[in-house]
Amino acid sequence: MGMLNEFKAFAVKGNVVDMAVGIIIGAAFGKIVSSFVGDVIMPPLGLLIGGVDFSDLAITLKAAEGDVPAVVLAYGKFIQTVIDFVIVAFAIFMGVKAINRLKREEAVAPTTPPVPSAEETLLTEIRDLLKTQNQNRLP
């Protein structure tokens, strides 16, 4: 039973829950970006290049024989995946940059020194009076 309680304590910590939410949102964001690249960016880009569908771009290394499928290098799908990665990496970069800017602004905000208590003020005055008396006694 002890291990189960330890696991519960670990699983409900803020960092673990935050990480799980981040992974789920990241997976959903990845699907959105893949759709954006495949359905919105690549068709016009293929049209500009000459009516090319990037997902069909491939080099056939060995033709299909009977039930054995062809061996191909699907470089069009690779190009789409690279564009997916660049968009996701850029979005993450912009998010981290914004978070770092907010952290910097919080760190730069000046803090006012705490107001000394009445006891501290009294002790400071006594110290200053003793210093003055000691300076007056010295020849």
Curated annotation (Swiss-Prot):
Taxonomy, superkingdom: Bacteria
Pfam family, any one: MscL
Record's keyword annotation contains RNA-binding: no
The keyword Translocase appears for this protein: no
Compartment annotation: Cell inner membrane
An example Gene Ontology CC term for this record: plasma membrane
InterPro entries for the chain: Mechanosensitive_channel_CS, MS_channel, MSC/AndL, MscL_channel
PROSITE patterns: MSCL (PS01327)
Sequence intervals crossing the membrane: 9-29, 79-99
PANTHER family: LARGE-CONDUCTANCE MECHANOSENSITIVE CHANNEL, MECHANOSENSITIVE CHANNEL MSCL
Annotated family: Belongs to the MscL family.
Reported function: Channel that opens in response to stretch forces in the membrane lipid bilayer. May participate in the regulation of osmotic pressure changes within the cell.
Oligomer status and interactors: Homopentamer.
Protein's name according to its UniProt entry: Large-conductance mechanosensitive channel
Gene source species: Pseudomonas putida (strain GB-1)
Record gene name: mscL
